[in-house]
Amino acid sequence: MTSEADDTIAAIASPMTPAPRGIVRLSGHDCIDVLCRMKVLDTDEASGRRPFRSSKTLSLGEPLGAIEVDVMVWPTQRSYTGQPSAELHLIGSAPLLQSSLDAAIRAGARAARPGEFTMRSFLAGRLDLTQAEAVLGVIEAEDRGTLDQALSQLAGNLSRPLQAARSTLLDLLADVEAGLDFVDEDIEFISDEALIQRLDELRSLLLQTRSQLSDRGGASSTIRVVLRGLPNAGKSRLLNVLSRTESAIVTDQAGTTRDLVTVESSWGGHSFQLIDTAGSESREESDPEAPISQEAQLQAAEAARGADVHVWCIDATGGDGFESLKSPNAVLAEAKRSAQLICVATKRDLMPTDWNGESMRADLAVSSESGTGVDSLIERLVQFAEQRDAGETGSVIGTAARCQDSLAAAIEHLAQAIQWTEQAAGHELVAAEMRLAVEAIGEVTGQVYTDDILDRVFGRFCIGK
C-alpha cells in the first residue's frame, strides 16, 4: 500500500448507524491548518503544543446549517499516528458525519484509504507489524477469548520476544563478523561451542513461537459442542433448550435425526456451535434403512472428530446408554486430543425426585422439559471455554497466516548456521545464514517490509482505522 505519507487524511471512524456519538478522524502535517480552514479551530489554539479539547460550531451549509462538535486535537507528533491528529465528535447521524467529512476534504484533507491511520502509526514506529494486525483483531473479535488474544498481541506479547531474539542474533552476528575482520589476529570473540548453544536457544524459541501461531491459526474461536448418544436419548430436545430455538425436530420415534443440525449460541462471552447428531446405532444389512443410517453415522463421526466438547446423552429411563460404550475412552477414541467428555443423563423429570444419575456414571442430570440441570451444563461448557482461553498463547489469525513462512525460513537458516559451525565450514557461511535469519525475523515484526506486505496487512482494515 503506497501512500502519500505527508498528506492530511480524513475518514469517518465510527459506524454509519444512528448513535449518540460519531467520529470524523484526521491526521497529517497540515491537520491544524485544515481545522482552521473548517473554522473549528482558532489561531490562538492552533499555536499550542499540548493536546486539548474544545467545543465548536461547524458550518455544513444548506440545508444542514451549523452543528455542535467537540474537537479533540493532538497538535504534535505525540499521537497515535506519529503526526498532528484530530477527531471531530458529533451526533452519530450518517448525513452529518458524511457532510463533516466532506467539509474536511474541501478544507484540504483527502479521503483516507483502508487502514491508513494504523499504517501511519506503524511507519512512525508507534506500533510494530504484529501490533498493527492486533488492532484489526480487536475490531473483528467476536468473543472474549479472541479479544483477549488480540489485546495481548497489541500489548507486544508476541513481538517483544521476537524483537529480543533478533537483537540477540544481531549481537552474535557482530561477534562472528568481528572474528572475520580479525582473522589474522589471535582473538576469539565467541567460541564455536558458545555460538552453537546460543543459536540453538534462539531456534528453540522460534520453533515454540511458530507452534503457537500454528495452533491459533488453525483454530476457531468458536467452541464446537457435539451432542451424541443412542437414538431417542433426548439430544434434539436438549439442543433446542440450550439454543432456545426449535432447530431440531423432536418426536418420540427413535432415529428422527439423520442430518446434522447446527446452531450457534453464546454464553459468558464465548461463542459455541451446538451440533445435534444421529443416534449411535447399527442396523442389519437387510434393513432398508441401513444405507441411510450408515451415512448418518459417518456424518456424526466426522462431526465428533472436530468437536471440542462431546456431550454424551443417556436416557435416564433406559439406563444402558453409557454401558454400551464400554468406557469413556471409547467416546473420545477418534476425537482430538484436547476434547472433553461430559456425560449427561437426560429426561430427569421422568425419574424419582431423589435420583441424581450417579448410578449411570453421569456427570449431570438434566430435564429438557423442566430445565433442571441445563444451567449446570452451560456452566460446564463456559468453564471449558475459560480454561481453553487461559491456555492459549497464540496470535490473531491474520498474523498466524502471514508469519508462518518467515518464521520457518528463520528456523531453517539458524539450523543451517549451526550445521556450518559444527562442520567448521567457515564463519563466512555461518554469518550469511545468520543475516538471512535476522531478515526473516524482521519480516514478522515489520522491521523488514515491502509495499506488498503492507498492502496485505492494512488492506484488510476498514476505512477510518
UniProtKB/Swiss-Prot annotation:
GO molecular function: GTP binding; GTPase activity; metal ion binding
Keyword DNA damage: no
Binding site for GTP: 232-237, 251-257, 276-279
Gene3D superfamilies in the cross-refs: P-loop containing nucleotide triphosphate hydrolases, Probable tRNA modification gtpase trme, domain 1, tRNA modification GTPase MnmE domain 2
Any one of the GO BP annotations: tRNA methylation
Disulfide bonds: none
Protein name (record): tRNA modification GTPase MnmE
Subunit relationships: Homodimer. Heterotetramer of two MnmE and two MnmG subunits.
Signal sequence residues: none
Localization per record: Cytoplasm
Keyword set, alphabetical order: Cytoplasm, GTP-binding, Hydrolase, Magnesium, Metal-binding, Nucleotide-binding, Potassium, tRNA processing
Cofactor annotation comment: Binds 1 potassium ion per subunit.
Homology family: Belongs to the TRAFAC class TrmE-Era-EngA-EngB-Septin-like GTPase superfamily. TrmE GTPase family.
InterPro entries the record matches: G_TrmE, GTP-bd, GTP-bd_TrmE_N, GTPase_MnmE, MnmE_dom2, MnmE_helical, P-loop_NTPase, Small_GTP-bd
GO cellular component terms attached to this protein's record: cytoplasm; cytosol
